[in-house]
């Protein structure tokens, strides 16, 4: 509104100037010259005032925010992997929050718009203005938004629940998408992760937490798949894993790379995403053929993986370790019953152990009743040829393979694994 008013006033002054200095048969008199000078000075003053038009402003609810600094920071993630990442974004500017909770940034950033920025608040005593919290979307301390040249942004938020309470007055369509993404993230967090402890001690609890995390990540990736806006999609991908670990959602990341590199092939972030999602940088995907590696078997023989798969209807390639408590639990509670139920019908398990000690390996196999199925290990710990060939970093992991060695599904555990095997063996 202020910009429109400036334009109207400029137009009025311009017309008056034309009237003062318009050609005449007579010379311009002294009074006309003084009027011309006055109008010129007023014109310059107005231009200077309008050039200081606030582009980003807002109101912060400070109640209950005694632990927070009365400051707002503006941060730019210059690369894709800097989005939602602590200590990486470049601090562009800062603004004081007054006692009434108001703040404003007068000078727009000299950036090629549209560009993703992050508005950040910090606790008292925090010396890094670009520290971003990602533990709890209800209280996280930043919000990403898109700066569009010529458009002012007006923010409202509760400083102690910054991300959850963040709102924009009359948001643009692209920023409306980010607000919708925030709402979806909050819903997914409350449904799947809230109350879950990262230090969950029980073996079953660890597997359940992994399942919940996957469900949370999938909701964010589904948003990225459904939106037509590039920058909100990039935020969704980063919120799915701020630490950049996409091993368990590799197929979803690959699909996103395919989508956005077709639409924005020249955008630097699309290129970064393409590099991350290169198949050589991801674990083997559903639909890929498993590498035909020569495996040292428990009995001392070396056999190619494809040879072990031949003539089977369904094979579980299980990557485990004697020291992996969730793996051991799955041996006893899931794999033993499945093997007993379906082995005679063409169901096989090939277990590869990340072992350094043959004795510990053998003891675990016998104790779990896992000596029913096939076992292999290079006895090189987690630095071994199979992990390298599968491009894996995390266990427990499994791959369900058809008779050709093609991956049908990955990383199914507990009831999900039972249901897949039951359905597959009954249908074929």
Per-range role (PLM):
Residues 1, 9, 13-17, 21-59, ...:
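Bacterial Sec-dependent N-terminal signal peptides
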Residues 51-208:
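A non-transmembrane, solvent-exposed segment enriched in polar/low-complexity residues
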Residues 226-230, 262-270:
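Short solvent-exposed coil/turn linkers within tandem alpha-helical repeat scaffolds
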Residues 228-242:
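Amphipathic alpha-helical repeat scaffolds of TPR domains
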Residues 294-315:
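A short beta-strand-turn-helix
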Residues 313, 319-334:
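Conserved redox-active cysteine motifs that mediate thiol-disulfide chemistry
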Residues 328-368, 379-388:
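Structural microenvironment flanking redox-active thiols in thiol-disulfide oxidoreductases
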Residues 370, 378-423:
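Thiol/disulfide oxidoreductase modules built on the thioredoxin-like
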């Amino acid at each position: 509104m202020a910009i429109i008013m400036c334009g109207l006033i400029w137009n009025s002054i311009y017309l008056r100037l034309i009237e003062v200095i318009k050609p005449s048969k007579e010379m311009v008199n002294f009074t006309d010259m003084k009027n011309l000078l006055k109008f010129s000075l007023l014109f310059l003053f107005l231009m200077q005032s309008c050039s200081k038009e606030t582009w980003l402003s807002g109101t912060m609810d400070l109640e209950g925010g005694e632990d927070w600094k009365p400051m707002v920071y503006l941060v730019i993630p210059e690369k894709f992997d800097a989005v939602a990442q602590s200590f990486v974004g470049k601090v562009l500017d800062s603004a004081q929050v007054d006692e009434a909770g108001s703040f404003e940034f007068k000078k727009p950033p000299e950036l090629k718009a549209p560009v993703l920025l992050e508005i950040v608040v910090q606790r008292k005593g925090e010396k890094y203005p670009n520290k971003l919290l990602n533990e709890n979307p209800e209280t996280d301390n930043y919000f990403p938004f898109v700066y569009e040249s010529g458009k002012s942004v007006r923010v409202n938020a509760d400083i102690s629940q910054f991300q959850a309470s963040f709102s924009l007055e009359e948001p643009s369509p692209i920023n409306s998408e980010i607000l919708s993404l925030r709402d979806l993230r909050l819903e997914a967090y409350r449904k799947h992760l809230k109350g879950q402890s990262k230090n969950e001690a029980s073996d079953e609890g660890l597997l359940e937490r992994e399942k919940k995390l996957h469900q949370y990540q999938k909701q964010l990736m589904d948003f990225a798949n459904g939106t037509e806006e590039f920058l909100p999609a990039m935020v969704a991908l980063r919120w799915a894993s701020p630490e950049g670990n996409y091993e368990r959602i590799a197929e979803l990341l690959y699909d996103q790379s395919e989508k956005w590199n077709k639409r924005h092939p020249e955008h630097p972030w699309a290129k970064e995403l393409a590099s991350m999602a290169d198949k050589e940088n991801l674990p083997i995907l559903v639909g890929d053929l498993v590498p035909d590696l020569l495996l040292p078997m428990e009995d001392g023989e070396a056999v190619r993986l494809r040879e072990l798969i031949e003539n089977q209807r369904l094979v579980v390639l299980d990557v485990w370790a004697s020291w992996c408590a969730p793996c051991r639990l799955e041996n006893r509670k899931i794999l033993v019953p499945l093997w007993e139920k379906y082995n005679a019908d063409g169901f096989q398990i090939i277990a590869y152990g990340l072992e350094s000690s043959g004795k510990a390996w053998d003891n675990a196999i016998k104790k779990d009743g896992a000596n029913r199925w096939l076992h292999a290990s290079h006895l090189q710990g987690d630095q071994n040829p199979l992990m390298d060939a599968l491009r894996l970093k995390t266990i427990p992991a499994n791959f369900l393979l058809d008779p050709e060695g093609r991956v049908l599904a990955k990383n199914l555990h507990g009831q999900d694994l039972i249901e897949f095997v039951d359905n597959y063996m009954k249908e074929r």
